[in-house]
Amino acid sequence: MKTFLILALLAIVATTATTAVRVPVPQLQPQNPSQQQPQEQVPLVQQQQFPGQQQQFPPQQPYPQPQPFPSQQPYLQLQPFPQPQPFPPQLPYPQPQSFPPQQPYPQQQPQYLQPQQPISQQQAQQQQQQQQQQQQQQQILQQILQQQLIPCRDVVLQQHNIAHASSQVLQQSTYQLLQQLCCQQLLQIPEQSQCQAIHNVAHAIIMHQQQQQQQEQKQQLQQQQQQQQQLQQQQQQQQQQPSSQVSFQQPQQQYPSSQVSFQPSQLNPQAQGSVQPQQLPQFAEIRNLALQTLPAMCNVYIPPHCSTTIAPFGISGTN
Protein backbone atom coordinates (compact mmCIF):
# COMPACT_ATOMS: atom_id res chain seq x y z
CA MET A 1 0.00 0.00 0.00
CA LYS A 2 2.75 2.41 0.83
CA THR A 3 4.40 1.82 -2.48
CA PHE A 4 1.12 2.42 -4.22
CA LEU A 5 0.64 5.69 -2.37
CA ILE A 6 4.17 6.74 -3.17
CA LEU A 7 3.65 5.97 -6.83
CA ALA A 8 0.41 7.92 -6.81
CA LEU A 9 2.12 10.93 -5.25
CA LEU A 10 4.91 10.70 -7.75
CA ALA A 11 2.37 10.56 -10.55
CA ILE A 12 0.61 13.61 -9.19
CA VAL A 13 3.90 15.49 -8.86
CA ALA A 14 4.87 14.49 -12.37
CA THR A 15 1.58 15.65 -13.77
CA THR A 16 1.85 19.01 -12.05
CA ALA A 17 5.40 19.41 -13.29
CA THR A 18 4.46 18.53 -16.83
CA THR A 19 1.51 20.91 -16.78
CA ALA A 20 3.74 23.71 -15.50
CA VAL A 21 6.21 23.01 -18.28
CA ARG A 22 3.71 22.41 -21.05
CA VAL A 23 1.37 25.40 -20.45
CA PRO A 24 3.68 28.08 -22.00
CA VAL A 25 4.44 25.85 -24.95
CA PRO A 26 1.08 26.42 -26.72
CA GLN A 27 1.42 30.19 -26.18
CA LEU A 28 4.59 30.18 -28.25
CA GLN A 29 3.08 28.02 -30.98
CA PRO A 30 1.09 30.86 -32.74
CA GLN A 31 4.22 32.98 -33.10
CA ASN A 32 6.52 30.33 -34.65
CA PRO A 33 4.60 27.09 -34.97
CA SER A 34 7.04 25.68 -37.55
CA GLN A 35 10.02 26.00 -35.21
CA GLN A 36 8.31 24.74 -32.05
CA GLN A 37 7.17 21.39 -33.48
CA PRO A 38 10.61 19.72 -33.12
CA GLN A 39 10.93 21.09 -29.58
CA GLU A 40 7.61 19.54 -28.57
CA GLN A 41 8.69 16.12 -29.87
CA VAL A 42 11.68 16.00 -27.47
CA PRO A 43 9.67 16.22 -24.22
CA LEU A 44 7.11 13.81 -25.61
CA VAL A 45 9.86 11.16 -25.98
CA GLN A 46 11.07 11.75 -22.45
CA GLN A 47 7.61 11.76 -20.90
CA GLN A 48 6.07 8.80 -22.65
CA GLN A 49 5.37 7.48 -19.17
CA PHE A 50 2.10 9.46 -19.10
CA PRO A 51 0.45 8.77 -22.43
CA GLY A 52 -2.98 9.56 -21.03
CA GLN A 53 -1.98 13.10 -20.14
CA GLN A 54 -0.24 13.81 -23.48
CA GLN A 55 -3.46 13.15 -25.39
CA GLN A 56 -5.15 16.07 -23.61
CA PHE A 57 -2.67 18.74 -24.76
CA PRO A 58 -3.06 18.38 -28.56
CA PRO A 59 -6.59 19.87 -28.46
CA GLN A 60 -4.98 23.10 -27.26
CA GLN A 61 -3.82 23.75 -30.82
CA PRO A 62 -7.10 25.55 -31.77
CA TYR A 63 -5.92 28.63 -29.83
CA PRO A 64 -4.19 30.00 -32.91
CA GLN A 65 -7.63 29.93 -34.58
CA PRO A 66 -8.43 33.48 -33.29
CA GLN A 67 -6.59 34.58 -36.44
CA PRO A 68 -9.95 35.00 -38.24
CA PHE A 69 -9.74 38.65 -37.14
CA PRO A 70 -8.66 39.45 -40.69
CA SER A 71 -12.24 38.59 -41.52
CA GLN A 72 -12.99 42.02 -39.99
CA GLN A 73 -11.96 43.50 -43.32
CA PRO A 74 -15.64 44.03 -44.15
CA TYR A 75 -15.41 47.04 -41.84
CA LEU A 76 -13.66 48.68 -44.73
CA GLN A 77 -16.97 48.41 -46.49
CA LEU A 78 -18.10 51.32 -44.31
CA GLN A 79 -16.57 53.57 -46.95
CA PRO A 80 -19.98 53.92 -48.61
CA PHE A 81 -20.66 56.73 -46.10
CA PRO A 82 -19.70 59.23 -48.80
CA GLN A 83 -22.84 57.98 -50.54
CA PRO A 84 -24.90 60.66 -48.67
CA GLN A 85 -24.05 62.82 -51.68
CA PRO A 86 -27.59 62.24 -52.94
CA PHE A 87 -28.52 65.40 -50.93
CA PRO A 88 -28.54 67.36 -54.21
CA PRO A 89 -32.00 65.95 -54.92
CA GLN A 90 -33.12 68.36 -52.18
CA LEU A 91 -33.15 71.04 -54.88
CA PRO A 92 -36.93 70.72 -55.11
CA TYR A 93 -37.13 72.78 -51.89
CA PRO A 94 -36.86 76.03 -53.85
CA GLN A 95 -40.09 74.94 -55.50
CA PRO A 96 -42.03 76.81 -52.77
CA GLN A 97 -41.55 79.78 -55.08
CA SER A 98 -45.06 78.97 -56.14
CA PHE A 99 -46.01 82.00 -53.95
CA PRO A 100 -46.86 83.95 -57.14
CA PRO A 101 -50.39 82.55 -56.89
CA GLN A 102 -50.68 84.96 -53.95
CA GLN A 103 -51.04 87.75 -56.50
CA PRO A 104 -54.73 88.11 -55.62
CA TYR A 105 -53.60 89.87 -52.42
CA PRO A 106 -52.51 93.02 -54.27
CA GLN A 107 -55.94 93.01 -55.88
CA GLN A 108 -57.33 93.86 -52.48
CA GLN A 109 -54.96 96.83 -52.10
CA PRO A 110 -56.86 99.16 -54.44
CA GLN A 111 -59.84 98.74 -52.14
CA TYR A 112 -57.76 100.19 -49.33
CA LEU A 113 -56.32 102.90 -51.55
CA GLN A 114 -59.73 104.30 -52.38
CA PRO A 115 -60.63 105.19 -48.79
CA GLN A 116 -57.08 106.53 -48.34
CA GLN A 117 -57.68 109.28 -50.93
CA PRO A 118 -59.54 111.50 -48.46
CA ILE A 119 -56.66 110.89 -46.05
CA SER A 120 -54.34 112.59 -48.56
CA GLN A 121 -56.59 115.64 -48.42
CA GLN A 122 -56.38 115.54 -44.66
CA GLN A 123 -52.61 115.35 -44.93
CA ALA A 124 -52.63 118.41 -47.19
CA GLN A 125 -54.73 120.25 -44.64
CA GLN A 126 -52.40 119.15 -41.87
CA GLN A 127 -49.41 120.39 -43.87
CA GLN A 128 -51.08 123.74 -44.38
CA GLN A 129 -51.83 123.96 -40.68
CA GLN A 130 -48.23 123.06 -39.88
CA GLN A 131 -46.97 125.74 -42.26
CA GLN A 132 -49.25 128.30 -40.67
CA GLN A 133 -48.06 127.26 -37.23
CA GLN A 134 -44.44 127.54 -38.35
CA GLN A 135 -45.08 131.01 -39.75
CA GLN A 136 -46.73 132.04 -36.50
CA GLN A 137 -43.80 130.63 -34.55
CA GLN A 138 -41.37 132.52 -36.79
CA GLN A 139 -43.28 135.73 -36.21
CA ILE A 140 -43.24 135.13 -32.46
CA LEU A 141 -39.51 134.39 -32.56
CA GLN A 142 -38.99 137.51 -34.66
CA GLN A 143 -40.82 139.60 -32.08
CA ILE A 144 -38.77 138.04 -29.28
CA LEU A 145 -35.53 138.70 -31.16
CA GLN A 146 -36.56 142.26 -31.87
CA GLN A 147 -37.30 142.81 -28.19
CA GLN A 148 -33.96 141.29 -27.24
CA LEU A 149 -32.13 143.34 -29.87
CA ILE A 150 -33.72 146.67 -28.91
CA PRO A 151 -30.38 147.77 -27.34
CA CYS A 152 -28.65 147.12 -30.68
CA ARG A 153 -31.33 149.14 -32.44
CA ASP A 154 -30.82 152.07 -30.08
CA VAL A 155 -27.04 151.89 -30.52
CA VAL A 156 -27.36 152.11 -34.30
CA LEU A 157 -29.84 154.97 -33.99
CA GLN A 158 -27.49 156.86 -31.67
CA GLN A 159 -24.52 156.52 -34.01
CA HIS A 160 -26.34 157.26 -37.28
CA ASN A 161 -28.90 159.89 -38.24
CA ILE A 162 -31.78 158.01 -39.81
CA ALA A 163 -34.79 159.87 -41.17
CA HIS A 164 -37.97 159.55 -39.10
CA ALA A 165 -36.08 157.37 -36.60
CA SER A 166 -34.51 159.92 -34.32
CA SER A 167 -34.09 158.96 -30.69
CA GLN A 168 -33.32 160.86 -27.57
CA VAL A 169 -29.70 161.75 -26.99
CA LEU A 170 -28.45 159.40 -24.29
CA GLN A 171 -25.79 159.96 -21.70
CA GLN A 172 -22.51 158.18 -22.10
CA SER A 173 -23.18 155.83 -19.17
CA THR A 174 -26.52 154.68 -20.57
CA TYR A 175 -25.01 154.36 -24.03
CA GLN A 176 -22.27 152.06 -22.66
CA LEU A 177 -24.92 149.94 -20.94
CA LEU A 178 -26.77 149.62 -24.23
CA GLN A 179 -23.57 148.51 -25.94
CA GLN A 180 -22.94 145.84 -23.29
CA LEU A 181 -26.52 144.53 -23.52
CA CYS A 182 -26.37 144.48 -27.31
CA CYS A 183 -23.11 142.50 -27.35
CA GLN A 184 -24.43 140.03 -24.77
CA GLN A 185 -27.48 139.34 -26.92
CA LEU A 186 -25.44 138.93 -30.10
CA LEU A 187 -22.99 136.53 -28.44
CA GLN A 188 -25.85 134.35 -27.20
CA ILE A 189 -27.15 133.95 -30.76
CA PRO A 190 -25.47 131.09 -32.72
CA GLU A 191 -23.25 132.00 -35.66
CA GLN A 192 -25.72 130.57 -38.16
CA SER A 193 -28.43 132.98 -36.97
CA GLN A 194 -26.34 136.12 -36.52
CA CYS A 195 -27.09 137.28 -40.06
CA GLN A 196 -30.79 137.03 -39.24
CA ALA A 197 -30.09 138.98 -36.06
CA ILE A 198 -28.62 141.84 -38.13
CA HIS A 199 -31.70 141.69 -40.36
CA ASN A 200 -33.89 141.86 -37.27
CA VAL A 201 -32.03 144.96 -36.09
CA ALA A 202 -32.65 146.64 -39.45
CA HIS A 203 -36.25 145.42 -39.37
CA ALA A 204 -36.70 146.86 -35.86
CA ILE A 205 -35.34 150.23 -37.03
CA ILE A 206 -37.80 150.29 -39.94
CA MET A 207 -40.65 149.38 -37.57
CA HIS A 208 -39.48 152.20 -35.32
CA GLN A 209 -39.60 154.53 -38.31
CA GLN A 210 -43.13 153.44 -39.13
CA GLN A 211 -44.24 153.93 -35.55
CA GLN A 212 -42.78 157.42 -35.44
CA GLN A 213 -44.35 158.29 -38.78
CA GLN A 214 -47.69 157.03 -37.53
CA GLN A 215 -47.32 159.03 -34.35
CA GLU A 216 -46.46 162.13 -36.38
CA GLN A 217 -49.49 161.55 -38.57
CA LYS A 218 -51.68 161.08 -35.53
CA GLN A 219 -50.35 164.28 -34.04
CA GLN A 220 -51.02 166.12 -37.29
CA LEU A 221 -54.55 164.72 -37.39
CA GLN A 222 -55.11 165.76 -33.81
CA GLN A 223 -53.83 169.24 -34.59
CA GLN A 224 -56.09 169.42 -37.63
CA GLN A 225 -59.06 168.28 -35.59
CA GLN A 226 -58.28 170.92 -33.01
CA GLN A 227 -57.99 173.52 -35.74
CA GLN A 228 -61.33 172.42 -37.16
CA GLN A 229 -62.94 172.73 -33.78
CA GLN A 230 -61.42 176.16 -33.32
CA LEU A 231 -62.66 177.24 -36.76
CA GLN A 232 -66.12 175.95 -36.03
CA GLN A 233 -66.16 177.85 -32.77
CA GLN A 234 -64.91 180.99 -34.49
CA GLN A 235 -67.56 180.66 -37.20
CA GLN A 236 -70.26 180.32 -34.60
CA GLN A 237 -68.94 183.37 -32.81
CA GLN A 238 -68.75 185.36 -36.05
CA GLN A 239 -72.31 184.48 -36.93
CA GLN A 240 -73.37 185.95 -33.64
CA GLN A 241 -71.28 189.12 -34.22
CA PRO A 242 -72.31 192.07 -36.55
CA SER A 243 -71.71 191.86 -40.34
CA SER A 244 -68.79 194.29 -40.06
CA GLN A 245 -66.58 191.41 -38.93
CA VAL A 246 -67.39 189.22 -41.94
CA SER A 247 -64.18 190.32 -43.69
CA PHE A 248 -62.16 188.36 -41.12
CA GLN A 249 -63.72 185.06 -42.25
CA GLN A 250 -61.95 184.89 -45.61
CA PRO A 251 -58.39 184.16 -44.42
CA GLN A 252 -59.71 181.69 -41.85
CA GLN A 253 -61.42 179.51 -44.48
CA GLN A 254 -58.04 178.33 -45.78
CA TYR A 255 -57.52 175.86 -42.87
CA PRO A 256 -60.17 173.27 -43.74
CA SER A 257 -58.85 172.97 -47.30
CA SER A 258 -55.48 171.73 -46.00
CA GLN A 259 -57.12 168.95 -44.02
CA VAL A 260 -58.01 166.97 -47.12
CA SER A 261 -54.43 165.75 -47.65
CA PHE A 262 -54.32 163.83 -44.33
CA GLN A 263 -56.75 160.94 -44.05
CA PRO A 264 -56.82 158.09 -41.50
CA SER A 265 -56.21 155.62 -44.34
CA GLN A 266 -52.66 156.95 -44.64
CA LEU A 267 -51.72 155.10 -41.46
CA ASN A 268 -52.04 151.79 -43.34
CA PRO A 269 -52.55 149.48 -40.33
CA GLN A 270 -52.04 146.40 -42.52
CA ALA A 271 -48.43 147.45 -43.10
CA GLN A 272 -47.64 147.39 -39.41
CA GLY A 273 -45.12 144.74 -38.33
CA SER A 274 -43.77 144.02 -41.84
CA VAL A 275 -41.38 145.57 -44.33
CA GLN A 276 -43.07 146.57 -47.56
CA PRO A 277 -41.38 145.85 -50.92
CA GLN A 278 -40.98 149.57 -51.59
CA GLN A 279 -38.97 149.82 -48.37
CA LEU A 280 -36.29 147.34 -49.52
CA PRO A 281 -33.76 150.04 -50.54
CA GLN A 282 -34.18 151.70 -47.17
CA PHE A 283 -33.83 148.32 -45.49
CA ALA A 284 -30.55 147.67 -47.34
CA GLU A 285 -29.13 151.02 -46.22
CA ILE A 286 -30.03 150.43 -42.58
CA ARG A 287 -28.67 146.89 -42.75
CA ASN A 288 -25.34 148.20 -44.05
CA LEU A 289 -25.20 150.70 -41.19
CA ALA A 290 -25.84 147.88 -38.71
CA LEU A 291 -23.13 145.75 -40.34
CA GLN A 292 -20.67 148.63 -40.06
CA THR A 293 -21.44 149.17 -36.38
CA LEU A 294 -22.33 145.96 -34.53
CA PRO A 295 -19.75 143.32 -35.62
CA ALA A 296 -16.80 145.62 -34.91
CA MET A 297 -18.28 146.80 -31.62
CA CYS A 298 -19.05 143.29 -30.30
CA ASN A 299 -16.23 141.42 -32.07
CA VAL A 300 -18.74 139.13 -33.80
CA TYR A 301 -18.17 137.40 -37.13
CA ILE A 302 -20.88 138.02 -39.71
CA PRO A 303 -20.69 136.03 -42.99
CA PRO A 304 -20.14 138.12 -46.13
CA HIS A 305 -23.36 136.98 -47.79
CA CYS A 306 -25.32 138.77 -45.08
CA SER A 307 -24.77 142.09 -46.90
CA THR A 308 -25.98 140.73 -50.25
CA THR A 309 -29.15 138.85 -49.32
CA ILE A 310 -32.22 140.29 -51.00
CA ALA A 311 -35.12 138.88 -48.98
CA PRO A 312 -34.67 139.85 -45.34
CA PHE A 313 -36.34 138.06 -42.49
CA GLY A 314 -39.74 139.56 -41.81
CA ILE A 315 -40.75 141.10 -45.14
CA SER A 316 -44.46 140.88 -45.92
CA GLY A 317 -45.26 138.53 -48.77
CA THR A 318 -41.95 136.61 -48.42
CA ASN A 319 -40.80 133.73 -46.25
Curated annotation (Swiss-Prot):
The alpha/beta-gliadins can be divided into 5 homology classes. Sequence divergence between the classes is due to single base substitutions and to duplications or deletions within or near direct repeats. There are more than a 100 copies of the gene for alpha/beta-gliadin per haploid genome. Residues 267-278 have a biased composition (Polar residues). The lineage of its organism: Eukaryota, Viridiplantae, Streptophyta, Embryophyta, Tracheophyta. Substrate of transglutaminase. Residues 28-125, 258-278 are annotated as: Disordered. It comes from Triticum aestivum (Wheat). Residues 28-58, 105-125 have a biased composition (Low complexity). Residues 1-20 form the signal peptide. Gene3D superfamilies: Plant lipid-transfer and hydrophobic proteins. Belongs to the gliadin/glutenin family. Residues 59-71, 81-104 have a biased composition (Pro residues). It comes from the Eukaryota. This is Alpha/beta-gliadin A-V.
